[in-house]
Amino acid sequence: MNITIVLGDKIPSIKYGGTQRVMWYLGKELHKRGHKVTFIAGKGSSCPFAKVIELDPSVNLNTQIPTDADIVHFNIPVPEGITKPHLLTIHGNGIPANADRNIVFVSRNHAQRLGSESFVYNGLDWDDYGPANLTLSRKNYHFLGKAAWKVKNIKGAITVVQSIKNAQLDVLGGYRLNLKMGFRFTWNPRIHFHGMVDDSKKKVIIEQSKGLIFPVTWHEPFGLAITESLYFGAPVFGTPYGALPELVSPEVGFLTAHGQEMAEHIQSAQYSPKVCHEYARDLFNSSVMAEAYLKKYETILNGEPLNKEVPHIIDIARRLPWD
């Protein structure tokens, strides 16, 4: 099958870029299965296993799609007048105005909140991450995500760690001084800011972490921070919003909207790094994801829509409770 994957940004992603990372691994897995993959992606993109067409925003996107494409997998709004079989994966909490019925979301909760039952969990190629060292001593906790986004609730994560005697927090994805969202300065010797980190540094820190503190105050569509942390043996302590109840089972973490309850649980609970690792490795890998997307492609190529109706926003609540 000739499959074209359309992205708005450059591939590969080096430090951050969840959509690019997931779609890169999808393309890689499809290539391994014998499919011909073409990426349409941002300026400067390159790929060793697929043809790359540089996205030209000044030209009608329909004219940039290869004529031999059997199906087009969009990750940006579908252009008007599209005639090729296609689908759109929605990665955020919104829907384009021109949406049709061939839409895929990234978790069950994500789909249901946007009027759909069609979803595929994000998967990663764990071989790229290398083997997880599950025997290291675990000392600090970590936060992984764009700390500047208020809904990621870095303040909540810091408060939880501060309430645990001698606990320290490694912040991956944030800075002690942040001027982008107004003046924010965090001074606490127990909180360590690492900025945007690459995969190797991320691995070193999480393999020595007692757990991911993830008290988001919005409906997280998926959360690669969760599956990456679990893969490296770190349990997840988060809020019961969005996809988290689907991703975090009791054997690999704990969910609550109350900071004190989270802190108390963290101090008394014990989790197996091996169980966390195997859980993420087996359930959220790129092979499982590719298999699910191939079923979606087959449905569309058989002339059937992925949704009975055009998805629409049902619940997009922001700033959910946290105390």
Please place each PLM-identified region on the residue numbering.
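Short alpha-helical segment that forms part of, or immediately flanks, the ligand-binding pocket
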Residues: 203, 226-231, 245-246
